[in-house]
Structures are given as structure tokens and as C-alpha cells.
Design a protein with these regions (language model features):
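Phosphate/ribose-phosphate-bearing ligand recognition and processing surfaces
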Residues: 96-182
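Polar low-complexity intrinsically disordered regions
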Residues: 1-3, 181-182
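Glycine-/small-residue-enriched capping loops at alpha/beta junctions
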Residues: 2-120
């Protein structure tokens, strides 16, 4: 079932930001963003769902990258193939955990790094989940502000924030309304 578009904002130059409710694995984009940890161990949350759908090659490639380069710091992003998924790649954004400090800035940094990975590969459309809001427990108000600020300078044609859970949807839509752009 296609995602429901809940809000749209047009950022200059020509970036359409859409807040949608649906399944990240079915998004009509070139690449999706994964909510990752620094070890790229995709066991739980969005990462676990994505990894199981992609097949073992996604985790194997992630393990190889971490073995060669070491753990990734909070605020960074790295690209892997998408395995069995219908995307050109998966961008793994390492968001902050609540309590480590400067969560809002680190979350913005992780998403900006993810969008930069997409631009470097010539990808024009990406969809990202509610990074850091689940098992990393960053408060939804902080996440919502970071999501909107990071997209403003994404320099991509279409950026979609794909959400599932009602509390996250409500928090993001409230932030969109606060910014007066819905």
C-alpha cells in the first residue's frame, strides 16, 4: 500500500520535503536511510527490519566496512548496497542516543551526512525513518526539530520522512505547523 502524504514543504532550491506514513521498504526513492549504530550491527528496530528484508549481504558488507575502517562516530553516515531491496543503496546514519549530550546537533549532523552521501552518488531522492527516536530514545520534540532543520539544506529533489507510529507522526506534524510551513 502506498504511503500517505501527511505534509509537504518546498525548500529552495527545488527540494520537496514530504512527511509520509508508510513502510520505508516500499518508498518510491533511489535510496533509503537506515537508523544505524556505530558498529553497523543491524539487529533491532528499523535497522533489524531493513537488514532482514535486504538479506545477509547487507550485514556482511557492513561487518566488512567496520572491520576495515573501525566503528563509525555518532553524526556520521556510510553507504552499502541494498541487497535484495529495490534501492540503489542504503545510507546508514549513526544518530545519537539520549543522554550522550548535544543530541539535536548530532542528529542533524548524521542526517546531513546521509544527504551528502546521496548527493555524492548522484541520487536525487531519499527517504529516512525517525532516526534516534526509537531504541535510542531521543525525545520526539528534539528529533522533529532536527529532522526539519537537516532537510533545509539537503540539496536533493525529494526527501521523504517515512513514519509509522502515531506519537512520532504527531510530533513531526506539530513541528511542521510550528514552523508555519505545512
Amino acid at each position: 500500500m502506498p504511503a500517505s502524504v501527511l505534509a509537504e514543504i518546498r525548500f529552495e532550491p527545488a527540494c520537496l520535503f514530504q512527511v509520509v506514513q508508510g513502510n520505508l521498504l516500499e518508498e518510491p526513492v533511489e535510496a533509503i536511510v537506515n537508523a544505524a549504530n556505530g558498529m553497523l550491527a543491524h539487529g533491532g528496530g528499523v535497522a533489524g527490519i531493513l537488514s532482514r528484508a535486504a538479506g545477509p549481504e547487507l550485514q556482511e558488507e557492513s561487518d566488512r566496512i567496520v572491520h576495515e575502517r573501525g566503528p563509525f562516530p555518532t553524526g556520521s553516515a556510510v553507504v552499502t548496497t541494498a541487497g535484495k531491496l529495490p534501492f540503489k543503496g542504503v545510507i546508514h546514519a549513526v544518530g545519537p542516543r539520549y543522554g550522550e549530550g548535544a543530541e539535536e546537533e548530532k542528529l542533524e549532523q548524521a542526517l546531513r551526512a546521509a544527504f551528502a552521501c546521496a548527493r555524492e552518488r548522484g541520487w536525487r531522492s531519499v527517504s529516512f525513518p525517525a532516526v534516534s527516536s526509537g531504541i535510542f530514545a531521543v525525545p520526539l520534540e528534539i528529533c522533529s526539530r532536527a529532522y526539519l532543520r537537516s532537510v533545509r539544506d539537503a540539496k536533493l529533489e525529494n526527501v521523504r520522512l517515512c513514519l509509522r507510529d502515531a506519537p512520532v507522526v504527531e510530533a513531526v506534524l506539530a513541528e511542521v505547523a510550528r514552523q508555519g510551513k505545512a
